[in-house]
């Protein structure tokens, strides 16, 4: 427990330095420790808390703040249009990208097993952390500080022209489509790996299989890029066979 206390002290010092960049001066250490504690870390260290409760609160706060922002910023858009915008802003892939850009991964408290499986790269965990930290800020410093922080981070990022074209998460879209009414298993398989090309880069070819049937194929210089392109290809093909609307 002494190690955890020392680690938490150093972590809080680093967090204070991070938030100071945004003119945010955090106070209550425990809120932020809880917001950063994954259940795998809590299990290993016999802690009574994880970030899940904070994530629950942060999710609600974020939905409210983004709804208010969109309502005030786009008076000419109808309910359906602003709902669609909100879903794009608060979706997992968008929040995860923001956390990557802010370099919050080193602050995460993960168990050894989760570290081994690169939990600090998983979209779900990164998105959860943004929401849980929003809750910590709300409990520590209040609504006005949270609103300003969201505007200076999330809103600023998504306001860049063409942002959503760059960040679109086709893998998540495909998974959500299947979960909505298709019980078949989705798998990504590496079928080809090129010899090192210019700059020692390797080109990977991945296929997306649904229920053992190949639906999509993609090539990229990383596994992640190839999987995203395979998912995009699969979504386009599914759009021709179902009522799914593929938004290009």
Curated annotation (Swiss-Prot):
* GO biological process, alphabetically ordered: mRNA processing; regulation of gene expression; rRNA processing; tRNA processing
Keywords on record:
Cytoplasm, Endonuclease, Hydrolase, Magnesium, Metal-binding, mRNA processing, Nuclease, RNA-binding, rRNA processing, rRNA-binding, tRNA processing
Mainly localized where? cytoplasm
Pfam families linked to this entry: dsrm, Ribonucleas_3_3
Nuclease recorded as keyword? yes
Q: What is its EC number?
A: 3.1.26.3
User: Per its UniProt record, what NCBIfam families does this chain match?
Assistant: RNaseIII (TIGR02191)
* Protein name, as recorded: Ribonuclease 3
Organism, as annotated: Spiroplasma citri
Q: Which gene encodes it?
A: rnc
